[in-house]
């Protein structure tokens, strides 16, 4: 049992708890350098004593914001080996940009042309902002050149076609809810 006690005491300095031991930041930096350098075979394995000193000095020198910036890429590098786990979020990100931004744009303009009761409950400021410029754009374009094809009414007609059924259902639901409450129609 005495051997185990000695091993437990010595493992605190050389084992995995070395990264969390409070004596000095240089031991933590050395443990991190060993952990990273062993798996990747990087440049830190060539001179193990120099990186521990260099690793400790900038960490104590830089403000906490710089430390957090340094820690983030390390986490990405450690997780870089598990790229299979990161593929679904990347596909979600790539699908968000072209597809969902367009659908959100058309949805906002479609909800502006449709039932105001449903759009006012979700967001108050965005329908007012979106309906103001769209209405003024379509009026100025119609007044300036009536023979020219107008992209704004075409887009709004497309949105009305896509969201007409949804807006109609929302209007009916609102109508029925007002009837059940006993309030007169507005």
Swiss-Prot record:
Domain of life from the UniProt record: Eukaryota
Cell cycle as UniProt keyword: no
One Pfam family matching this protein: FAM104
Modified residues (Omega-N-methylarginine): 4
InterPro entries in the cross-refs: VCF1/2-like
Family membership noted in the UniProt record: Belongs to the VCF family.
Protein name: Protein VCF1
Organism: Homo sapiens (Human)
């Amino acid at each position: 049992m005495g051997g185990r006690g000695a091993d437990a005491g010595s493992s605190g300095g050389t084992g995995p708890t070395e990264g969390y031991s409070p004596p000095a930041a240089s031991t933590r930096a050395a443990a991190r350098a060993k952990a990273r350098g062993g798996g990747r075979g990087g440049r830190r394995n060539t001179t193990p004593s120099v990186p521990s000193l260099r690793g400790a000095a900038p960490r104590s020198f830089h403000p906490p914001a710089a430390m957090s910036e340094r820690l983030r890429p390390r986490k990405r590098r450690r997780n870089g080996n598990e790229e299979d786990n990161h593929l679904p979020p990347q596909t979600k990100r790539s699908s968000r940009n072209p597809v969902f931004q367009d659908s959100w744009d058309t949805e906002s303009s479609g909800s502006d042309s449709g039932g105001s009761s449903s759009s006012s409950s979700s967001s108050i400021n965005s329908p007012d902002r979106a309906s103001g410029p769209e209405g003024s754009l379509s009026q100025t374009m119609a007044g300036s050149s009536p023979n020219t094809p107008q992209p704004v009414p075409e887009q709004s007609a497309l949105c009305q076609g896509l969201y007409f059924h949804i807006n109609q259902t929302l209007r009916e639901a609102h109508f029925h809810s007002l009837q059940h409450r006993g309030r007169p129609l507005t």
